[in-house]
Regions:
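Glycine-rich, aromatic-flanked loop segments that form ligand/cofactor-binding clefts
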Residues: 1-2, 125
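Extended aliphatic helical segments
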Residues: 15, 22, 54, 77, ...
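C-terminal beta-strand edge segments of enzyme domains
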Residues: 45, 124-215
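Active-site catalytic loop in hydrolytic enzyme cores
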Residues: 3-93, 97-113, 179-181
């Protein structure tokens, strides 16, 4: 619901076949790049409480996380879900051509980042993406499902709707994280910079002054 600032939350929901709302998750990261207007309508989800909840709906047989779109670019999100015991992360997404650089095809980069986050956190990634056109944006579809080994199990075309079906062996998560124990060998005591806000005048990191902050 909108707060005093008039902004709402971008929220992913899970609905049972009966129509019952069984889970929801607030989007935690809001894009502010040129040509994006999401921050005009939505604010980031609250960090207090449990910002990365893991759900186990009846009948599904799996523990899932449900971040949204821009969240998928942040490895910290996938890692947080993995630490919370998620086996599958579902990213409802609406991404396509860049508003300011329409000829720049980010589809391969988008997919590589998500697959890589699944590898380094031992997760299955289920990523439905929008297709079609709206205004100056052409959404590039390409919805896909990947496993912890980095294999894309099934993928939709860029320019048409599709239903994707894949068999997921959830034991692969355990096997992968035993082979590569990323969670056990973390060094959270050394990650202080990750929890320190970035100065808007130094958006490229410490020691780099910004010439302008594009909005």
């Amino acid at each position: 619901a909108p707060a005093a600032d008039g902004l709402g939350f971008n929220t992913a929901i899970l609905v049972a076949p009966s129509g019952e709302l069984v889970a929801r998750t607030r989007k935690m990261h809001i894009p502010i790049s040129a040509g994006y207007y999401e921050d005009t309508y939505f604010r980031a989800g609250p960090a207090d409480g449990n910002p990365y909840p893991v759900h186990r709906p009846d009948g599904l047989g799996a523990r899932i996380g449900m971040p949204t779109c821009w969240d998928e670019w942040f490895p910290e999100v996938a890692r947080s879900y993995s630490l919370g015991g998620a086996e599958i992360v579902v990213y409802p997404t609406a991404i396509g051509s860049e508003p300011v650089f329409p000829a720049f095809d980010t589809q391969p980069l988008w997919q590589q980042v998500i697959v890589a986050n699944g590898i380094n956190s031992g997760l299955f990634m289920v990523v439905p993406n929008r297709t079609g056109d709206e205004g100056k944006v052409r959404f590039y579809g390409s919805s896909f499902i990947s496993d912890p080994y980095g294999r894309v199990l099934v993928q939709a075309p860029r320019d048409e709707e599709a239903v994707l079906v894949a068999d997921l062996d959830l034991d692969q998560r355990r096997d992968w994280l035993e082979l590569f124990p990323f969670l056990l060998t973390r060094r959270p005591d050394s990650y202080t910079p990750l929890t320190t806000p970035v100065d808007a005048q130094r958006p490229y990191g410490a020691g780099h002054e910004a010439t302008a902050v594009v909005k």
